[in-house]
Every structure is written in C-alpha cells, then in structure tokens.
C-alpha cells in the first residue's frame, strides 16, 4: 500500500465486528496514511457518528450487531454534515439484495470479503481524489 494521496489528515470510520478483519483493515489503512476510528458494533458506530466530525471516508460492514450497516448507512445519509462522506459497504456474502439496498440508500461502493488489499486501496484512493 502506498502513502496517502494528499498531505492533509485522512480519517476513516471503520465499523467492523469481526476482530481479525478489523485488525487487518486498521493495519492496511494506517500504512496508507489514514487515522482509523474503529467501532466494533453498530451502536458504538452510531455513538461515534454523533460525536465526531465527518471523516474522509467510512467503511461499514453490512452485518453488525445491534444496528446493521444498512441502518447506519441510512442514519448517516440523514445527517446534513455527513452527506458528502463517501461510504463503502463491506459484506461477507455477495447477496445482491443487500448490495442493491446499500447502493439505493446512499452507499458509494461495496466490497465482498475477503477482499484484495490492493483493490481496497485503489477504491479508497479514488474517493479521496474525488473529494479533494
């Protein structure tokens, strides 16, 4: 993974309940220059969303305990100050209905786990470039 594409601070909210996946993502993202704010469940993510300024990007697992990624996505899209934040959904299975719902609700992209780290990096960089 290369360094971040711009000099300003890149913050990413990661909502992922699977510990191994979260550790891998935090490592990859930190190497890419991101400051990662991690929530291990949907309720924790909602609390963080209410308390933090909008990040550069959001990665949401679709299947989270307490509040699903789809519920969080809808919640984020209702917050005016978060409207511009790119959101990538992560899913353990390629259920077309969930993917369609996510895109219709306001997700910018999705990735099926297990994911290719280089592909994830490329997708994130694409959204960072668009935002800059």
Please provide the spans of the model-predicted regions.
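The feature encodes the CheY-like receiver
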Residues: 65, 83, 95, 113-114
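C-terminal output helix
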Residues: 115-125
């Amino acid at each position: 993974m290369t360094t971040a594409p711009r000099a300003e601070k890149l913050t990413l909210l990661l909502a992922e309940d699977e510990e191994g996946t979260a550790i891998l993502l935090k490592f990859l993202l930190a190497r890419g220059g991101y400051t990662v704010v991690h929530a291990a469940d949907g309720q924790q993510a909602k609390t963080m969303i209410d308390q933090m300024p909008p990040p550069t990007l959001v990665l949401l697992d679709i299947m989270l305990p307490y509040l699903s990624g789809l519920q969080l996505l809808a919640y984020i899209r209702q917050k005016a100050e978060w409207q511009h934040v790119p959101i990538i959904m992560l899913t353990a299975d390629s259920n077309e209905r969930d993917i369609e719902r996510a895109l219709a609700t306001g997700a910018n992209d999705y990735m099926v786990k297990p994911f290719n780290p280089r592909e994830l990096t490329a997708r994130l960089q694409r959204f960072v470039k668009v935002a800059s």
